[in-house]
Amino acid sequence: MICQIRKQSYTLMKENSLTVPVVELLNVHKGFDGKDIISHFNLTINNGEFLTILGPSGCGKTTVLRLIAGLETVDSGNIMLEKQDITHQPAEQRHVNTVFQSYALFPHLSVFENVAFGLRMQKTPAVEMTPRVIEALKMVQLDELAQRRPHQLSGGQQQRVAIARAVVNQPKVLLLDESLSALDYKLRKQMQNELKALQRKLGITFIFVTHDQEEALTMSDRIVVMRDGRIEQDGTPREIYEEPKNLFVASFIGEINIFDAIVLDLLDEQRVRALVEGHECVITVSFLVNIGQHLNVLLRPEDLRVEELGDGMQAEGMVGYVRERNYKGMTLESNIELENGKMVMVSEFFNEDDPDFDHSLDQKVDVTWVESWEVVLHDEDVA
């Protein structure tokens, strides 16, 4: 039964555009103890996508999840599920299921009974319930452990039970509240891949909440970055990482170097000559600038190039000195101090055939990058 539903929903997902809204939050406001948590909040989540809400602690991301689930009530605004207003609908009547960080498994029940619990509450006939539970357990590769109790399972297995218990109810949307954070690094990486594969297989919309940037980049079709109850940027993982809209998003997602720049000359509509940390070079801008304007130039550590400078050699870029380097297997990460005192992070893919690759401490180097690889933003303070 659930196998047929799964195939039908996956086919439906492929036939329909991912721009078909399944969840909409319209001008939603929620506060606690007189403090606004989210205000004038608008978000559309499309059918069949894996959306991650990412942000630091206290940004409001879990509140958004709980409002969708019906575990909190809105102060104002509307929540829609497939164009139906569910703003005041109780949680048990919404076709939405939640996997919590704690998994919330019943310790006295077997794996099978934990997964079957929701169906029993709905008074689902045994002839239908049993194959649905077995199929859900097969999807998370736990059908052979159906009679075990939660304490007999690993953390990853417990998480799979929680997911099976949620998907067996055939929800339109599955909500996951930091549900990988309790796992160790290796298991978390494994579960990231398994969750994404399961989401593709089911065709269900997943809404995942996390503060872990790597998780968000790895698993998501789309990422919503939040701060102080508002959306800072909404885009694909690549857009979020490579085209951050402001310094908060840039510095929250991965490591990044932020350079001060002053416009010296306008070359054309996109290219300007600028002084970047004392080095004159050409940078690409996506907005109108004026001569003398201060800008921020952003470059990821992996976008910078380093060449050692010997006596009498002329630098093409910014001159600096290697103050620290860390070998990390595939990469060599260096901390470089520029002549003006600014510290720069550089990540280079390890090349064992290059005798000059592993730089010595205090080695004088030339730091450059490929023109147009930089992201240029208006000057602002780092969040």
UniProtKB/Swiss-Prot annotation:
A Gene Ontology MF term for this entry? ATP hydrolysis activity
Q: Give the subcellular location.
A: Cell inner membrane
Where does the ABC transporter domain start and stop, copy by copy? 23-253
**Which cellular component appears as one GO term in the record?**
ATP-binding cassette (ABC) transporter complex
Entry keywords, A to Z? ATP-binding, Cell inner membrane, Cell membrane, Membrane, Nucleotide-binding, Translocase, Transport
Kindly give the InterPro entries that the UniProt entry links to this protein.
AAA+_ATPase (IPR003593), ABC_SmlMolc_Importer (IPR050093), ABC_transporter-like_ATP-bd (IPR003439), ABC_transporter-like_CS (IPR017871), Mo/tungstate-bd_C_term_dom (IPR008995), P-loop_NTPase (IPR027417), PotA-like (IPR005893), Transp-assoc_OB_typ2 (IPR013611)
Record membrane topology: Peripheral membrane protein
Classification via SUPFAM superfamilies: MOP-like, P-loop containing nucleoside triphosphate hydrolases
Q: Which residues take part in binding ATP?
A: G55, P56, S57, G58, C59, G60, K61, T62
- Per the UniProt record, which EC number(s) apply here? 7.6.2.11
Q: Which reaction does it catalyse?
A: ATP + H2O + polyamine-[polyamine-binding protein]Side 1 = ADP + phosphate + polyamineSide 2 + [polyamine-binding protein]Side 1
Known Pfam families for this protein? ABC_tran, TOBE_2
Query: Can you state the subunit structure given in the record?
Result: The complex is composed of two ATP-binding proteins (PotA), two transmembrane proteins (PotB and PotC) and a solute-binding protein (PotD).
Q: Which family does it belong to?
A: Belongs to the ABC transporter superfamily. Spermidine/putrescine importer (TC 3.A.1.11.1) family.
Q: Quote the function comment for this protein.
A: Part of the ABC transporter complex PotABCD involved in spermidine/putrescine import. Responsible for energy coupling to the transport system.
Q: What is this protein called?
A: Spermidine/putrescine import ATP-binding protein PotA
Report which gene this protein is encoded by.
potA
